[in-house]
Amino acid sequence: MEKLTILLLVAAVLMSTQAMFQGDGEKSRKAEINFSETRKLARNKQKRCGGYSTYCEVDSECCSDNCVRSYCTLFG
């Protein structure tokens, strides 16, 4: 009977330890997903602009802020 009690206590400790480590793993995975989503949102919020020789109508559409004859230029 005494051996059974000790065995049950050891099993309970092992199970609680396993549950504790699994819980931390889920939290870190969620944090990783949240970090990934934050990067995507930041990237989407960045100014969208046309590179060299991209069609444009106004200066602000070009990364260089130079729209000449409907195309982005490197220099004004």
Curated annotation (Swiss-Prot):
Keyword Magnesium belongs to the record: no
InterPro entries of this UniProt entry? Answer: Conotoxin
The residues the entry assigns to the signal sequence are 1-19
**Residue(s) carrying 4-carboxyglutamate:** E57, E61
Tissue note: Expressed by the venom duct.
Main subcellular location of this protein, as a coarse class = secreted
Instruction: Name the UniProt key words of this record, in alphabetical order.
Output: Amidation, Cleavage on pair of basic residues, Disulfide bond, Gamma-carboxyglutamic acid, Ion channel impairing toxin, Knottin, Neurotoxin, Secreted, Signal, Toxin
Asked whether the UniProt record includes Disulfide bond among its keywords, one would answer yes
Disulfide-linked positions: C49-C63, C56-C67, C62-C72
Provide the protein's localization. Answer: Secreted
Phenylalanine amide is found on F75
A GO molecular function term, named singly, is: toxin activity
Q: Which residues form the propeptide?
A: 20-46
Cellular component annotations (GO), alphabetically ordered = extracellular region
Q: Report which superkingdom the organism of origin falls in.
A: Eukaryota
Write out the domain note: The presence of a 'disulfide through disulfide knot' structurally defines this protein as a knottin.
Q: Which family does it belong to?
A: Belongs to the conotoxin O2 superfamily.
Described by its record, this protein's role is as follows: Gamma-conotoxins may act on voltage-gated non-specific cation pacemaker channels (HCN). Potent neurotoxin.
What is the name attached to this protein's record?
Gamma-conotoxin-like TxVIIA
Species annotation: Conus textile
